[in-house]
């Protein structure tokens, strides 16, 4: 197969995003829709961040930075890793969102015929990124039981905690088992920590802290984080990744230089301002989303696949009401004006669970969210829409 043909086949292997499909329908319907299909925060980003972005533009701070980003921002980001897990700033890369960071990491570790391990219930873009990197996906149910999926072709393990869409928070035992397995098998562990500031039960376990106990050359964890969630900077597209070793950082730099050139300079100055805000914004944002989660659990508890212990979403089990959640979500949008994300894209292709699932956002305005839940319950014919 020619290179062009191979690239064409790779593109065709990427599933169409069910999230973008419902998003297009919402845009067509108009602003009166209760949009609970997408993770858009009600809490706005700090005013100091807005001012820092505008000031950077006004002062002409719009030239290229180095591919890994502003040195002062990389240094500040390295300091956000607790204890012995802190990387050197030279191994921290500023990226246009955590999504691009994960894509770049996968491209930097991929090889011909390689395999990446993904959670069975996963963010659809993770699967798209794996396929785009030319890797083959395999899916795991338990991050503490990975040996049955092992083969020499496995090069990456993606872990997402708190998880999108389920809200599952992996405990210390599960994270330790996944890390030990990856270190023993020499598999790169990609830790998607986008929702690190939204843990409602237990304490977040961080693979990088475990990695720090290994000799420098044996470390395997890429820690990926974002400003989109805690700091409410979704449209700014600002994230970062810490590479496990100097060699991995050199290879990641090649990918970024070839695909990115450099992150947005004004946005990086906005990121510095966000970090200078301290924890007050993060604490208030966490409290708001958690209170919304509690109310959604009270209203819709029987529909939840499980109570989300973290993150911005709840995964609904609608299998008693439909065998086609895509159709149900379209009908819910048309008849009740409520958008939720159909579940097909959150599980492996062809998984029979997908048509019975849907994802509901918890991070939007509380009263609007609760009204959306009431409409959903009424639409399903339940009597407890309260």
Outline where the language-model segments fall.
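Short beta-strand
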Residues: 35, 224, 304-309
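PLP-dependent enzyme catalytic core of the Aspartate aminotransferase-like
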Residues: 79, 86, 331-340, 346-386
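Conserved core of the PLP fold type I
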Residues: 61-180, 197-215, 384
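Helix C-cap/helix->beta junction micro-motif
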Residues: 29, 133, 184-185, 336, ...
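Conserved core segment of the aminotransferase class I/II
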Residues: 214-290, 379-380
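Hydrophobic residues in well-ordered beta-strands that form the structural core
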Residues: 118, 139, 191, 340-342
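Conserved glycine-rich beta-strand-loop-beta hairpin in the small C-terminal domain of fold type I
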Residues: 272, 288-297, 305-318, 356
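N-terminal small-domain helix-loop-helix segment of the aminotransferase-like
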Residues: 8-99, 104, 274-277, 383-386
């Amino acid at each position: 197969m020619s290179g062009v043909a191979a690239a064409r086949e790779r593109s065709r292997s990427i599933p169409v995003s069910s999230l973008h499909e419902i998003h297009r329908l919402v845009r067509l319907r108009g602003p009166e829709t209760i949009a609970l299909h997408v993770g858009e925060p009600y809490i706005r980003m700090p005013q100091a961040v807005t001012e820092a972005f505008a000031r950077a533009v006004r002062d002409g701070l719009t030239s290229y930075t180095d591919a890994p980003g502003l040195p002062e921002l990389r240094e500040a980001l390295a300091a956000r890793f607790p204890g012995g897990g802190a990387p050197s700033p030279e191994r921290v890369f500023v990226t246009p969102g955590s999504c691009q960071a994960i894509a770049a990491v996968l491209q930097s570790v991929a090889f011909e015929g390689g395999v990446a391990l993904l959670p069975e219930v996963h963010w659809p873009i993770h699967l798209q990124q794996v396929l785009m990197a030319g890797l083959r996906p395999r899916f795991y149910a338990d991050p503490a039981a990975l040996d049955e999926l092992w083969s020499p072709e496995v090069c990456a393990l993606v872990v997402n905690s708190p998880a999108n869409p389920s809200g599952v928070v992996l405990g210390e035992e599960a994270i330790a088992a996944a890390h030990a397995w990856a270190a023993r098998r020499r598999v790169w562990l990609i830790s998607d920590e986008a929702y690190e500031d939204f843990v409602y039960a237990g304490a977040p376990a961080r693979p990088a802290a475990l990695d720090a106990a290994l000799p420098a050359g044996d470390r395997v964890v890429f820690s990926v984080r974002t400003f989109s969630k805690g700091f409410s900077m979704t449209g700014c597209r600002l994230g970062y990744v810490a590479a496990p070793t100097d060699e991995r950082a050199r290879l990641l730099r090649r990918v970024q230089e070839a695909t990115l050139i450099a992150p947005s300079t004004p946005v990086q100055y906005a990121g510095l301002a966000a970090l200078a805000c301290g924890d007050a914004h993060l604490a208030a944002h966490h409290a708001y989303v958690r209170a919304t989660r509690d109310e959604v659990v009270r209203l819709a508890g029987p529909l939840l696949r499980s109570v989300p212990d973290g993150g911005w979403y709840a995964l609904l089990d609608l299998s008693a009401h439909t065998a086609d959640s895509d159709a149900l979500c379209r009908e819910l949008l048309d008849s009740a004006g409520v958008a939720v994300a159909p579940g097909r894209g959150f599980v492996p292709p062809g998984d029979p669970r997908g048509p019975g699932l849907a994802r509901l956002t918890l991070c939007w305005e509380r009263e609007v969210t609760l009204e959306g839940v009431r409409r959903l319950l009424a639409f399903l014919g339940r009597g407890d829409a309260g």
